[in-house]
Amino acid sequence: MAESHGGGGGCCPPMDLMRSEPMQLVQVIVPMESAHLTVSYLGDLGLVQFKDLNSEKSPFQRTYAAQIKRCGEMARKIRFFKEQMSKAGVTPKETLDRENDIDLDDVEVKLEELEAELVEINANNDKLQRSYNELVEYKLVLEKAGEFFASAHRSATAQQSEIETEQVGEDLLEAPLLQEEKSVDPTKQVKLGFLTGLVPREKSMVFERILFRATRGNIFIRQSVIEESVVDPNSGEKAEKNVFVVFYSGERAKSKILKICEAFGANRYPFSEDLGKQAQMMTEVSGRLSELKTTIGAGLDQRNILLETIGDKFEQWNLKIRKEKAIYHTLNMLSLDVTKKCLVGEGWSPVFAATEIQDALHRAAVDSNSQVGSIFQVLRTKEMPPTFFRTNKFTTAFQEIVDAYGVAKYQEANPSVFTIVTFPFLFAVMFGDWGHGICLLLATMYLILREKKLSSQKLGDIMEMAFGGRYVIFMMSLFSIYTGLIYNEFFSIPYPLFASSAYDCRDVSCSEATTIGLIKTRDTYPFGVDPVWHGTRSELPFLNSLKMKMSILIGVAQMNLGIIMSFFNAKFFKSAVNIWFQFVPQMIFLNCLFGYLSVLIIIKWCTGSQADLYHVMIYMFLSPMDDLGENQLFPNQKIVQLTFLFLALVSVPWMLLPKPFILKKQHEARHQGLSYAQLDETDESLQVETNGGGHGHEEFEFSEIFVHQLIHTIEFVLGAVSNTASYLRLWALSLAHSELSSVFYEKVLLMAWGFNNVFIWIVGILVFIFATVGVLLVMETLSAFLHALRLHWVEYQNKFYEGDGYKFAPFTFTLVGNEDE
């Protein structure tokens, strides 16, 4: 069994999320005849992460390589069917049949038959479609070239009388070469020929130029543009083409023209100069096209019927093949015993799953009619187990936020327990407007109420992220409403929701009022900021002071929580060294400086003192012996400050020096075989510091340990200052959000409302809505989210969280149907 690192008993909250599930390394010995069914049942259970016991073997050397190859071939056929169905617009049908009722051998035979039939149908359809496309081109050649020859014939008839009366006539461009052939002496006649076809339009000019140069101008070419694009018989793609007719003299010229046509992808078709034969060919081609169209339609109908038949069982077959492939992949991770009659497997599983695993093994043995049952046993190991948290749809997103930084080490304190509350709260501190919070809440409620429907749909990347984090956004919106009520801002407008303002103005111009110009006539405003501050000259200084001090208080509280979590870790892992020489000095250092500052802030709020806290903190270091004067907030403050300063200084060497020497002493005692009862209780940290992972015989490098501790100490001391300052981003982003909201309200909405024009009102409202949604509800939300993420990952988690574990990844069929091949 994986070694228990302590009970954690009373020191840790009894939460499922606080510690990862206790894990154990289990071994199963399965007879060969029941191995397949056993792995299948364990995949249905989904609680075992198998270890690869054949890592030294290549995939082709493993026991079930042939079966995986077989499944891969069936998966290829499934992908082929899916591609064909997609092209034909056929949608696979969801099936309620159990995939276990199908036999893989039957599926293989059926897929092979269907593939052969579909390939044959496609081949016939492609052949018919090619013939159809060729006939379409041939018909266009007959039409366009026929027009050219008919025009030439009419021109020849009109010029016949002139040719007879004149012995020498000037060659005209319109006079056909064939007609001139008739007008010359037969004994001197040169044999003329012509070729017809189609050439891609983008190549037509180059085609003509190459022909002219290759024959040295001894050709005559005519081209006619085809208005509509045609499907090329060779490529099957649509293309714009021209019909051409080339006249030449001599076989040599013909040979050159044929080669050029082939090079340019020009399709040639036979053509007769006889008008009667042209008409006959046109009739034959048209009839053939009609027949082919009918035949192709029947072939497509036959293919669609076949694809619909495939679609009825497609999902069932696909799931079966994927499951079988996953099973054989897992079986390849098991090793054969020496008798080659059993398979031995090892893997991690939660302790609570032991009974369920044994039940699955027993059922597999019974269902496979195995004469020998499977053996289940727990192994002892010093390996680090995987980390497994049981989450639900609400907590999953928060756990993913933590895991994005690093997966928790086995049974390390889990930050997401408190992140569920602190993350949306810190976001809301920066996004405090209850109007904007209501908008976020409405958008999130849409996602939550329709989650069943949306979870089954294919969403875009952004929408999928928003849907996955819907409960995070839900919590963010609730806390935004809460902090918005504290800030008393509704789209930057204050409302006296809980009572009237406690103050009245001394004069008419309340916007010029300061605290001196206000008279308190009623009880203090019961909740949040008094609405009277809005619009006054002192609004910004007042809110700045409030939010800045509040940010420091929140930051110090969360950093203290982080250090307290390190105490839970040390207590759970029974590491007294980390408690006394890490937790205690860190708490002293942080609270003697910034905890003290937080107390001063609260005292100043309660007493109304005018003391300058900047002066108090700076001169606490620079001149600790000077009198505080008007900056004194309570009696004996100077003595308290000197005590805190002394404790803070002492805590630094306290963190740095003892731990490395104690670890060295423990290591020496362990190797000398001495018994140190107290030290035995304390340390598992030696293994952590030396990356031993539980191996007690690794070489101890004192210099490395000391340098590591030095770095850790410096990091904490400097981080205490920088991390506290980092929390001031809460104030900065809250101020920015408030000011932007105020600008959009005053400079857009109110300015538009000042015009007595309905069109300007509508434009102003639209601009205000788009600015609010685009800038405040999208960009500001993303900005505040990222800053809250930073505060948790760096300022909070670095106090205790190592995050160097690895996730529990069990063998399961749950997601097999959605996996891409």
UniProtKB/Swiss-Prot annotation:
Knockout consequences: When associated with VHA-a3 disruption, day-length-dependent growth retardation associated with a reduced accumulation and storage of nitrate ions in vacuoles. Increased sensitivity to zinc ions due to a lower zinc ions sequestration in vacuoles. Reduced calcium content. No effect on sensitivity to sodium ions.
Compartments where found: Vacuole membrane
Membrane topology according to the record: Multi-pass membrane protein
GO MF, any single term: proton-transporting ATPase activity, rotational mechanism
UniProt GO BP: proton motive force-driven ATP synthesis; vacuolar proton-transporting V-type ATPase complex assembly; vacuolar sequestering
Cytoplasmic face of the membrane: 2-422, 492-549, 604-641, 779-821
Segments traversing the membrane: 423-443, 471-491, 550-570, 583-603, 642-662, 758-778
Main location: membrane
Tissue: Expressed in etiolated seedlings hypocotyls.
Superkingdom assignment: Eukaryota
Family: Belongs to the V-ATPase 116 kDa subunit family.
Subunit (UniProt): V-ATPase is a heteromultimeric enzyme composed of a peripheral catalytic V1 complex (components A to H) attached to an integral membrane V0 proton pore complex (components: a, c, c'', d and e).
Name listed for the protein in its UniProt record: V-type proton ATPase subunit a2
Organism: Arabidopsis thaliana
Lineage summary: Eukaryota, Viridiplantae, Streptophyta, Embryophyta, Tracheophyta
